[in-house]
Structures are given as C-alpha cells and as structure tokens.
C-alpha cells in the first residue's frame, strides 16, 4: 500500500480545522447515518452473512442485474486486489496519474505493468486495464464512447472501470449499460465517497457471470461487516436523497478554482469534479506540513502519484467558509519558507 493517501488525520496530533485532503462528501447527513447504525448495533454480537448476501441481492435489484453479477467488497480497494489476484501475472495497462492501489495490487500479484500517460491516452493489447472515471486525482472524465471503443477494440482484455467518484461528476456517464454487451467489462462502485462512510468500508463489483465467478474464487468469508451490510442496504433504497447537490457543489468549486487562479504561484488543473489538482511553484510536502502546523489545514500532497511531482497537491471543495480559510492561509504563508 502506498504511504501517503489522503485523510491521514491519524498521523497528526494537530487539531484539523479543515480537511481538504479527502474526496469524500463533506456535508453528509451523519446524524441519519448514525441513527441507522444504532438501530442495528446488536448485529455486532453475531457473525455477518458470509458473502454479504442480502446486500448483494439489493445491489442486483438496484442495478437490474442478478446476484451472480455482483461481488461485495470491504471497500472498493479490496475489489481491486481481488481482481489483481484473479489475473495474477497478467499484462496490465495503468493510465497515470491515477489511484495508486491499482498499481499496488498489480505489484503484489506480479503483473507486467504498462504505465500510459492520460494525456493523449492510447490503449493497447493487454490482459487487463484499470481506469478511474472520473479520475482521481485530476477529475478527468472518460466519455462513454471512449470506454466502449476500448471494449470493442480489445475484446480479449478485461477493462475495470472504477466509478467511485461518479456522483461528483455530472458529465460522467455510468457504464453499467454496457455490461449486457461486453463480457470483458467490470464496474466498481464505492459507497464510501458519496455517503461519507469511509470507516465502514463498503463497495461492490458488477460484471459478466463468468468473469465474476473467476474473481469470486479469491474472496474471503465475512469480508463485509454486519453494520456495513445494513447501512449499504439502506443507502441503496434511500440514498438518492442523501447524495451531494452537485450543481451547487460544482458552482462553489468553480469559484474556488478562480480564487486559486488569482493566487501567485498556484495554477489549478481543469477538473470535472469537486476535487482538483493544483500545480505550485512550491514544494507540496513542505506546503502540506506548514498548512497543518500553522493553520490546522490538511491538503493532499500529490507528489507520490505516479506521473506527478513534488509541485502538485490536491484539494476537495468544502464549504465557502473553509475554502476561504485555505485561501487566506496560502496568502499568509511566507513564500521564502516553501
């Protein structure tokens, strides 16, 4: 696992006043989620379902599929490792920059990895390919036609589409409609980001029954805990009322981006999501530490994304008050110390 994911609050003894380092929805109805968890708290005294069967049934119903087309995971990340295990030793294409756990999973299972820059991206023959749509860390959106072209052009290659952030990008089209036409497609969903439950760990995978069977052989029993199963079912049934208002969120993000444009030494990278990269003349690891120590503000140092360097960091869009807090802090930091 890469040392340096976002939301690394646990590493700091400093009080965090504003956490820009994670792409999780910042304004979720945590009181409602807490009440659902409390309702089911006694389930912790019993073993959960071995393969989260009732959650899988609800996922299948939600997506108009069969349970045989679904695997539940202890977060989306577990699913990436299951796929890498099932395709152990494969030739695998990884666009960069992107989420590090694709690479980490492939490294663990001895894949021959081919890193292809996202800029002017061209696919090629391989056994497996991972894409993140919209992409983390830069908010790039893959058009549905691009995804379908890859599936058509390389029918022997399994394409994994990670849609963990799709609720934050109105221009991104879900590709589950392609599942019926392409047996070489896997779609990953995370419950973590849109509903702000990263500590519960819950995600799921959709795909052709034969492909799902190949991967299911590597799953472990009881990989999803009892509380995650219950809140997952609740969110699939009622979650549309809890999703981010992306229209308002992205308007605030555009204001945030414009403010960065006016800051000397900071250049925001175009993004179609609420989070975005910023290129800076400063060193991001130092900037991160200064913001944390002096202002209690946490950003995501993006220097450890393959394809980026120490002059990139990532921020999520938060409330107007917290966005202004970061901008004021950057104006106050002495440039000579960065």
Show where each model-derived region lies.
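PLP-dependent aminotransferase class I/II
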Residues: 29-32, 184-262, 266-269
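Conserved PLP-binding catalytic core of the aspartate aminotransferase-like
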Residues: 250, 263-295
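Short loop-beta-helix segment that forms the pyridoxal 5′-phosphate
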Residues: 48, 60-82, 95
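Active-site pre-lysine segment of PLP-dependent enzymes
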Residues: 119, 124, 140-159, 163-197
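N-terminal "arm"/small-domain region of PLP-dependent enzymes with the aminotransferase-like
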Residues: 1-46
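Short, conserved charged micro-motifs
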Residues: 31, 126, 283-289, 321-325
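PLP-dependent aminotransferase-like
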Residues: 85-145
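PLP-dependent enzyme catalytic core of the Aspartate aminotransferase-like
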Residues: 145, 293-294, 306-338
